[in-house]
Amino acid sequence: MLLSSSSSSPTNFNPNATYPRISKFAYLDPLELVIGDCEIGRLALVAPFAVCRGDEGTPIHIGDYSNMQDGVILHALETTSHGKNIDDRRYSAEGSLLKANNSEFKNGFAIYVGDKVSLAHGVQVHGPVYIGNDTFVGMNSFIFNANIGKRVAIGVSSTITDGVTIPDNKFVPPGSIIATQAQADALPPRVGSPYEKINSAVLHVNQELAKGYDARIIQRLATEIEGELEQEEMLQTGSPTGNPNVMARR
């Protein structure tokens, strides 16, 4: 449910104001901030103080069932300037880094966060970045200019940058700095690591929270609308409806 958002501001690199596109089945906390060209999928959860700024590098995609936990920041380097595309600033939905003259550039993403991805508290993702499905990014980690594969587990306070690609099914130990492809290729497997099953547990919790918070908000809105309708009826008829819930709220 979309609760707090705004359009981007027109600039020489993004001349058109763009509003976020949010699934009606996503949950966004009232204290989040989503600006501009951000797309958030079904049963995604955006927690308090999380920020998605689709006002410079665009667009930003957050897949179905993914979660942005408290204090997560998503932002990206500009993808176009004065109407011209910029090399290596967008990824395809399949994870290919795109050149400016690639016909797929217009359909690419400054940040692509796949389905069932967990971005834990305080994570910063600065595009160009690609994160594959079913990946966990641990608390206070930083990802900039990197391609993260599927089913990867990234330990807390890690840094991944300088154009590296983390292969599928890898484990990034806590506190790691991965800035060369040789470091990325030498990472151990996720299976058998302390983080082997962490994402499934985190996904379960956040999907339940998304459904629960959405249901609670819908019920509250329904109750408020019912009350407003009954108050309007009272004004028209001059007599109370007798609904004890409405009477109790007055």
Predicted feature residues:
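Glycine-rich hexapeptide-repeat left-handed beta-helix
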Residues: L2-R21, D55, P59, G63-D64, ...
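Extended, small-residue-rich solenoid/repeat segments and analogous flexible loops
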Residues: M1-L43, V51
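Small cofactor-carrier domains centered on a conserved lysine used for covalent cofactor attachment
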Residues: A47
